[in-house]
Amino acid sequence: MTRWLLLLIPILFLTLDGSAQGSLSIAGTVKDIKGEPLPGAGIYLSGYKIATVSDNTGKFTLPGLKPGSYDVLVQMIGFLPYTKNVILSDKSISIEIIVKESVTQLKEVVINIDPNRQFYINRFKDQFIGKTPNSEKCKILNPEVLITEYDKERRILRVTADEFLIVENQALGYRIKYLLKYFESNFESNIIFFSGLPHFEELKGSKSKKRKWLQNREIAYAGSSQHFFKSLYSNSTKEEGFIIYKLREVENKNRLADKLIDYKIKLFTSQSRNAFLTDPSNDSLIYWQRKKNEPKTLEVLNRTEVQTDTLVKTIYKDLKTINYQDALYIMFTKERESKQYTTMSGHAVGRPPDIPNYQISVVHMINAPANFYEYGAVLDPRSLLYSGFWGYEKVADMVPMDYTPLQKSE
């Protein structure tokens, strides 16, 4: 079964935990291009439940923040969404936000032209929301804002949006406003990449629903990449249930050269064209076709546990970094992979027969180094490539950065 890879969901979580109150703030004024203040604009922090509204003079304040890198999102009816990255160090910051009016008529015409649009939207939903059990209770409320483009020659689907995508997650109890910057699904390389800025809102529900949502959130957080990097920052991966190995790619020395294989395939194809099925040349052709399908490289698992103090370095007070050559093979021992995931998802990675069906993710370093914050936020969206369980989990299994797991008694 084809295995899909996920380039680290980017710009999802670029900030620190809003639940751990700090003394800094981001303040500012929202104006139109004429300089007139805009009251009633929604101001959000990407990856959080933190939000406010501009007052009658267009002013706003987002208080209680810690040092870190924040993405401010602004939404106002009749205007295009606005984003601005703000870095807080040792003092609060004031910013001016200028938003532009939205023009939608042309986009509506373009949407109606493409006869394959619904097919592309369905593909996008599967690869953006995901195909986990939680995805069955997720719904995109405004798919009409999506703009699709398919490159037939390169077999790449691209999706963007000029407005917030609204995702209702009835599995976790969140309404997500997602400003989709970019989505690309490459059907040649099997790599999915998407970047965007989400804001989380709590859904209303009964007490029983909220209890169920809390249970599901605990499951979604446990073993996630956010959980891993948070524990990696605090040097507590072992206690949190993670085991880290290294996975190395080596040349498959038993594989014959492509030049020889291609020659043999051409030779026996020619001989078998007018032959009966029992002709020996058919068996030879099958043999060489199998040789063609043999992998050029093999994966070798080094089962010496990686010590986090050798993997992680501190570069700034609130920022740490990792840089490595071979892929990280990360096992989460407190949850198991389901049979459906292992056999049907197309994301499962190989494991030695003596390793239980722990949740396994493989993390490749694409653009070194990878910097990350205390609460699981990876700074550079294109630094890491996920396969395995983290490539399987997508928007349907996201929790906000200010999510705090329950304290479990020993």
Q: What does each model-identified segment do?
A:
Residues 1-29:
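Bacterial Sec-dependent N-terminal signal peptides
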Residues 21-38, 234:
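Structural motif
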Residues 24-32, 58-60, 97, 109:
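A short, amphipathic beta-strand motif
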Residues 41-45, 72, 111:
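Hydrophobic beta-strand segments
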Residues 45, 73-84:
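A short, solvent-exposed loop/turn motif at the edges and junctions
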Residues 48-59:
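Short, acidic Ser/Thr/Gly-rich low-complexity loop/linker segments typical of extracellular
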Residues 52, 80-95:
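Structured interaction patches on ligand/partner-binding surfaces of diverse proteins
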Residues 90, 98-410:
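Surface-exposed, low-complexity/disordered segments
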